[in-house]
Swiss-Prot record:
Residues 132-329 form the ATP-grasp domain. Disulfide bonds: none annotated. Belongs to the D-alanine--D-alanine ligase family. GO terms for molecular function: ATP binding; D-alanine-D-alanine ligase activity; metal ion binding. It comes from Psychrobacter sp. (strain PRwf-1). One of its GO terms (biological process) is peptidoglycan biosynthetic process. Its cofactor is Mg(2+); Mn(2+). It catalyses: 2 D-alanine + ATP = D-alanyl-D-alanine + ADP + phosphate + H(+). This is D-alanine--D-alanine ligase. Residues 1-17 have a biased composition (Polar residues). HAMAP family: Dala_Dala_lig. Keywords: ATP-binding, Cell shape, Cell wall biogenesis/degradation, Cytoplasm, Ligase, Magnesium, Manganese, Metal-binding, Nucleotide-binding, Peptidoglycan synthesis. Residues 18-28 have a biased composition (Low complexity). Residues 1-28 are annotated as: Disordered.
């Protein structure tokens, strides 16, 4: 997993981590008993189960290594009402059921503190169409799109969005079911692939340029990461995210200080527009004219060895164990 990172990766224009929050990173100097019994929820039944298992096991080990009474809880095998026997929840349940407001609503009903966003932001964030409609209504730049159906006029979609374009399931994460479409003839097949993952499918204008991700923790934008897939004509797909080792991650990201600050501010505005809380990630593109375009939000980001949140935290001087403690501490 090639990665460009220097010890001075912190952008001086970015919002700094405050002294008291930085001190929270000294996880091992604190009393782990303050958290009580912690359920680390991961696995589940969604198409992102494999990623959730990887993320959740990493988080579980990081918490347990610091003396926290943390236990794996898998909704696929356990009755979710049993969560009432815990004091708080670290949610690493990617995809439907864990990232779309369902788990958040249950935990609210049980009165359990939980990491991350609540019902509203989770439900909106898991719906790419609703997210983009909201951002557009707030005056935030997001790539043009159209909702597809079996009876869609494919030629009209191409006339409107141009080629290439990208087709996505509206309610999936981890780039599952996504396809780049280069010709009109490829569009129906891409629709079928995406429709096989869910009930709603969208096409989005292809933005030629550089891809970035912006990690947000405690309403602070961390150093921007530039993503460079080995195949620069393609996109940051599932294979590049989790299985390949030739994707490059650049910190510093190569933007000027002014551009990075602008992208961080845009991402914070997008994060707050959907009422997201705690931690998350915004994906964006910069086109060849230098304009930034919001793609989507992730309210339960990956925490695997390939994941972007740990990379951004590392650029802030925070190791993985400290990061997990810090996120869990948001529930206190």
């Amino acid at each position: 997993m090639p990665m460009t990172m220097t010890q001075s990766a912190t952008n001086p224009t970015a919002t700094p981590v405050s002294a008291n929050k930085a001190s929270a990173n000294a996880a091992t100097t604190q009393d782990p008993s303050i958290f009580g019994k912690v359920a680390v929820v991961f696995g589940g039944n969604s198409n992102e189960r494999a990623v959730s298992l990887d993320s959740g096991n990493a988080v579980l080990q990081a918490l347990q290594s610091q003396g926290i009474d943390a236990t794996h809880f898998d909704p696929k095998d356990q009755d979710v009402t049993e969560l009432k026997n815990y004091d708080r929840v670290f949610n690493v349940l990617h995809g439907r059921g864990g990232e779309d407001g369902q788990l958040q609503g249950l935990l609210d009903w049980l009165g359990l503190p939980q990491t991350g966003s609540g019902v509203l932001a989770s439900a909106i964030g898991m719906d790419k169409v609703r997210t983009k409609q909201l951002w557009h209504g707030c005056g935030l730049s997001t790539a043009p799109f159209a909702v597809l159906g079996a009876d869609t006029d494919w030629q009209q979609i191409v006339n409107t969005l141009g080629l290439p374009l990208i087709v996505k399931p509206v309610h999936e994460g981890s780039s599952i079911g996504m396809s780049k479409v280069n010709t009109l003839d490829e569009l129906p097949k891409a629709y079928e692939v995406a429709a096989g993952c869910g009930d709603v499918v969208m096409a989005e204008k292809w933005i030629t340029g550089r891809e970035f991700t912006i990690v947000i923790i405690d309403d602070e934008a961390y150093p921007v990461i530039r993503l460079q897939p080995a195949d620069i004509s393609n996109f940051y797909d599932y294979e590049a995210k989790y299985n390949r080792n030739d994707t490059q991650y650049h910190i510093p990201c190569g933007l000027s200080a002014e551009e990075e600050a602008h992208l961080q501010a845009l991402s914070l505005a997008a994060f707050k527009a959907v009422d997201a809380k705690g931690w998350g990630r915004i994906d964006a593109m910069q086109d060849e004219e230098g304009n930034f375009w919001l793609l989507e939000i992730n309210t339960v980001p990956g925490m695997t060895s390939h994941s972007l949140v740990p990379m951004a935290a590392k650029a802030r001087g925070m190791n993985f164990e400290q990061l997990c403690w810090h996120i869990l501490a948001q529930t206190l």
